[in-house]
Design a protein with these regions (language model features):
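GHKL (Bergerat-fold) ATPase N-terminal catalytic module, capturing the glycine-rich phosphate-binding loop
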Residues: 1-105, 109-110, 118
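GHKL/Bergerat-fold ATPase module in large chromosome/replication-associated machines
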Residues: 42, 60-83, 104-108, 114-178
Length: 178
């Protein structure tokens, strides 16, 4: 899993990955209140998704290089049981972050292309940014519930219904809730 975002410093790795679900209930509730007041999307902010990877992994490694000018390229590594380690890499990486999940033998199926695409579409189809797998765009439907009613076109309702219902039919009607 890779991005070309701002990357992380060693302090970021310790703060964000050093403690399981570090953000905690209080921060979650504050963010939820902000979301209800028109704030940011909550998907991906509380560590649960990242730490769930240890259910299927022997080891998870995070390779990262921050946008900060003097930042080092780093490797964070953990088996999910005995803490974690952070090391500075000799060879510099490009800015961004790459996560490598080393699967347990019994979860080898999750390395198959068809299975990864199926899981991405099932669980990440509505994230607010494009997802690509081996160069192919895989999340096809935008999260219409995150838009105001006036910003959603009728064909977007149709597409959403067709995706959810697994049909080519159009809905008889629709109602928008916010």
């Amino acid at each position: 899993i890779a991005d070309t975002g701002i990357g992380m410093t060693e302090a970021d790795l310790v703060e964000n990955l050093g403690t399981i679900a570090h953000s905690g209930t209080k921060k979650f509730m504050e963010a939820l209140k902000q979301k209800q007041e028109g704030g940011a999307d909550l998907i991906g902010q509380f560590g649960v998704g990242f730490y769930s990877s240890f259910m299927v992994a022997d080891r998870v490694e995070v390779f990262t290089h921050s946008y900060e000018p003097e930042a080092a390229s780093l490797r964070w590594s953990s088996d999910g049981r005995e803490g974690y380690s952070i090391e500075t890499l000799a060879e510099p990486l490009d800015r961004g972050t790459r996560i490598v999940i080393r699967l347990k033998d019994e979860y080898e199926e999750f390395s198959q292309e068809y299975r990864v695409k199926e899981l991405l579409r099932r669980y990440s189809n509505f994230v607010g940014f494009p997802l690509n797998f081996n160069g192919e765009h895989v999340n096809t439907v935008q999260a219409i519930w995150s838009k105001s009613k006036s910003d959603v076109k009728p064909e977007e309702y149709d597409e959403f219904y067709q995706f959810i219902a697994h049909t080519d039919e159009k809905p008889l009607s629709y109602m928008h809730f916010s």
